[in-house]
Structure formats: C-alpha cells, structure tokens
Regions:
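Positively charged, helix-rich recognition surfaces that bind polyanionic ligands
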Residues: 5-174
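Short amphipathic beta-strand and strand-loop transition segments with alternating hydrophobic
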Residues: 1-3
Length: 174
C-alpha cells in the first residue's frame, strides 16, 4: 500500500476468541446510550435490573478542538473557494475519527472493568433530511463507527455485542 509517498505493508489475520457463555439470568450487561452532547452514557446492570455502575463518557477538549477547526473552515470558505479547503476538511475528519476511537476504547474498557458479558447499543437509524441548527453536529456524529469499533474491541476481549430497537429506550431507562 502506498500512502504519502511511502510504502506500507498490511497483513490480515484471523483470531479465535471464545465469547462468554454465561446464562442469561447471571449476565452482567453494559448498556450504552450514544448521544450528541454527551458522547456516551454507560450503565452496568445485572439481568434482574440491579444497577452496578454508571459512567458518563465525554471528551470536551477534543470536541472543542474539532469545533474550532470547523469554525476556521467556515471562515476560510467564506474568503476562498471550497476547493482550496479540502486539506482542512481532511484534518477535521481525522480529528472526528480519533474522537470515535477514544469513545469506543473507553466503552470497552469500562465494560471489561466490570466483567460485562454483553454490551448493548440502541440501533440508531437516521432517515430523512436533517435541517436546522444541529445539522452539522448530526452529520459529524460517528455513531456507526463507534459501534463498529466497540464491537471489534469487545469481541477481542470476549464480550458479546447486541443491538436493540431505539424506541422507548430513553423513556423506559431508569
């Protein structure tokens, strides 16, 4: 693979990992609520509903850096053409991807800390046209990347990942 005038080797490999086979009644669950303002809220609970812990995952300095870069892009686009701003958009994209990696790592670390058997995400589907003030925030929200990265890291640690319907999850959460 050639990138930035340098050559790199990339090897693919498979890894055999046994996922936890705990009975449903004895499982420890890590439920994750991905948000726009707070990056994620993790709740550790038993199958009977006993809450063992809760953690708010937020990286405000990283998000502030990203929004600062987006403001610089906005100012630059006003003065120049949008073609000349591609490198700045690439930088913002890399910052956003790094933020999603940090969030996924923090979720997996928290689940492993409590020896969770399964991590549960809500299945978030975005349909239709987005308008209004939070349009850019929603477009930059890397919910699917966070879920994929977290799934990969969790499977390497032997933790299962499950998706549930997003309907009524916030209303029914205690």
């Amino acid at each position: 693979e050639r990138k930035h005038h340098k050559y790199f080797l990339r090897f693919s490999y498979t890894e055999e990992v046994t996922l936890s086979k705990t009975a449903v009644k004895q499982q420890v669950i890590c439920s994750v609520d991905l948000g726009i303002n707070t990056d994620a809220v993790c709740s550790i609970m038993r199958a009977d509903g006993t809450i063992l812990g809760r953690k708010f995952i937020n990286f405000p300095s990283d998000k502030d850096h990203l929004y600062h870069v987006l403001g610089r892009i906005r100012r630059f686009q006003r003065e120049h053409s949008s073609r000349q701003v591609q490198s700045r958009w690439d930088y913002a994209k890399r910052l956003n991807m790094e933020l999603s990696r940090k969030i996924a790592a923090e979720i997996t670390k928290y689940a492993a800390e409590y020896q969770a058997d399964v991590i549960v995400f809500e299945y978030l589907e975005m349909q239709g046209k987005i308008s209004g003030k939070k349009k850019q925030k929603l477009h930059l929200w890397r919910k699917r990347d966070i879920q994929k990265l977290c799934e990969h890291q969790a499977h390497r640690n032997g933790i299962r990942v499950s998706m549930v319907s997003a309907r009524n999850t916030s209303r029914l959460a205690c």
